[in-house]
Structure formats: structure tokens, C-alpha cells
């Protein structure tokens, strides 16, 4: 199997010969790109342009780098996963619920932060959004004030929406080293994004414009998984499609958490 660098070199040559929009067939196994060809080879192929394939490999390289993010710590010590919900997206809703279950499977202790009453109708209102963040962040500081972060061998932050801003800001301000899963981040999230983070965004998310999220993720080298036509909950309204989305999303989450 070729390395990512070898695949990118092949793609650059093919793009010069046939153009960036030439269709090829990407071969994947367990969600990992293994190569590409000009004829479909079932069942592990998807049709894709050379340009999109190039972007897919870049994202996979970032994902592998984020998954393998490590820091000096006692790996035999307990592991802690902290859940940072959104304003209306609580810890028992699908993305956070299943991500928490995966973390528990890998022997993480689970701690869910909860917020008190926050301003309503904050969408599109910068002042209310700022107030909601400040209130939720203050409550987060209080909820986590007694934790000895140095006593844990591995730390994982799992967050959603405004919770991605809170989690990233908290980790940055307290210099907490660990991995972070960002479900439907906001643009403000990337002001604090740190190494070892991955993000998930729906292209129909009314809370965050896709081009802005894509640009910010690239600037911070945060691997970004885009779900076409999905909203702020990574849902489309089609039950079967939504079940497929949660399955694909959790496969990425599982690999990310499982990587030492």
C-alpha cells in the first residue's frame, strides 16, 4: 500500500495529464483511503474527482496526526472524558451519547458539564451569544475547579456547538493537554482550537457557514469531516440517512479515541 505522500505525488501527475476534475475510483477499507484506480473495484470504491481525492488525503493525514497526538503522562493512570453539551443539545442526545459510550468502552471516566439557565434565541444575536458563552464558561469553571488534571493519564474533551467554544477555551486557558472532539463547531471555536482536535460539520448548518468553518479548520490544521445537507445536529430529516450519518461519524470517533 502506498504512503499518503506517494498517493499525492501520483495525483499531481494525473491532474496535470487529465485535469483536476477527472473522475477516478478511491479504494477505502474501514474508512481509510488505500489507493485509487480508473476502473471501479467493488466493494471498496467510490467515484471522486482527483481534486476531491487530493483534499481527502490531506484531511486523512491531518486526522492521523490528530489521532496520534500524545504528550508526556502516566499512561497507566486513570482516563477522563469531559462532555460539553450545546445550549439545547444535551449529553443524552445522539452525538454526545454515543461518543460517551465509546469513551467509556475505552475505559474513560465520564463527566458531563451542565449549564444553568442561558439566554434564549441567541442565533444571529452576537451580544446574546457572547453572554451565553460567558455564563456557560463561568459555570464550567465552577464545575471543574476541583479536578486534578495532572492525575489523569489521558484526557478527552467531547463537545457540541457552543460547548466546542467552551471546551477549547477551557483547555487553552488551563493548558490542558489531551484530545478533543468538536461536533458542529462555531467559528469562535477555532480561536482556541488546539493540537489533537477533530471536527464534524454539516453543510446545511444554519449556525456556521461551511466555507468559513473549512477555512478556519485548515488554518488550525484541524481535520474536518463534512456531512452534505446535514443541519446543526448532523441530521437531514431522513431517518435512514441520519442513521447512516451517526454510524459513519461514530466510526471516525471510535478510531480517534482508540488510537493511543
Describe the role of every protein-language-model region:
Residues 230-244:
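Catalytic histidine-centered segment of alpha/beta-hydrolase-like enzymes
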Residues 87, 203-206, 229-231:
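Acidic beta-to-alpha connecting loop that harbors the catalytic carboxylate
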Residues 18-50:
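Acidic, low-complexity, intrinsically disordered interaction modules
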Residues 199-201:
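Short beta-strand/loop motif that positions the catalytic acidic residue
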Residues 63-151:
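Serine-hydrolase catalytic machinery in alpha/beta-hydrolase-like enzymes
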Residues 158-167:
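Gly/Ala-rich beta-loop-alpha elbow adjacent to hydrolase catalytic centers
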Residues 206-212:
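Conserved alpha/beta-hydrolase "acid-adjacent" motif
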Residues 176-185:
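A conserved short beta-strand
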Amino acid at each position: 500500500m502506498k504512503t499518503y505522500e506517494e498517493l499525492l505525488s501520483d495525483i499531481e501527475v494525473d491532474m496535470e495529464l487529465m485535469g483536476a476534475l477527472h473522475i477516478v475510483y478511491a479504494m477505502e477499507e474501514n474508512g481509510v483511503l488505500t489507493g485509487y484506480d480508473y476502473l471501479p473495484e467493488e466493494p471498496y470504491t467510490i467515484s471522486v474527482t482527483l481534486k476531491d481525492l487530493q483534499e481527502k488525503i490531506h484531511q486523512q493525514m491531518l486526522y492521523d496526526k490528530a489521532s496520534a497526538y500524545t504528550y508526556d503522562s502516566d499512561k497507566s493512570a486513570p482516563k477522563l472524558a469531559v462532555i460539553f453539551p450545546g445550549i439545547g443539545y444535551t449529553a443524552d442526545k445522539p452525538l454526545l451519547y454515543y461518543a460517551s459510550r465509546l469513551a467509556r468502552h475505552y475505559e474513560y471516566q465520564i463527566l458531563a458539564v451542565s449549564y444553568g439557565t442561558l439566554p434564549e434565541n441567541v442565533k444571529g444575536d452576537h451580544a446574546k451569544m457572547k453572554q451565553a458563552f460567558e455564563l456557560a464558561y463561568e459555570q464550567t469553571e465552577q464545575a471543574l475547579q476541583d479536578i486534578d488534571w495532572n492525575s489523569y493519564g489521558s484526557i478527552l474533551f467531547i463537545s457540541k456547538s457552543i460547548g466546542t467554544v467552551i471546551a477549547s477555551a477551557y483547555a487553552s486557558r488551563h493548558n490542558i493537554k489531551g484530545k478533543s472532539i468538536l461536533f458542529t463547531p462555531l467559528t469562535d471555536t477555532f480561536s482556541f482550537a488546539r493540537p489533537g482536535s477533530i471536527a464534524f460539520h454539516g453543510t446545511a448548518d444554519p449556525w456556521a457557514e461551511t466555507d468559513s468553518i473549512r477555512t478556519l479548520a485548515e488554518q488550525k490544521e484541524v481535520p474536518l469531516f463534512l456531512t452534505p445537507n446535514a443541519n446543526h445536529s448532523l441530521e437531514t430529516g431522513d431517518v435512514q440517512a441520519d442513521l447512516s450519518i451517526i454510524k459513519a461519524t461514530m466510526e471516525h470517533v471510535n478510531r480517534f479515541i482508540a488510537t493511543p
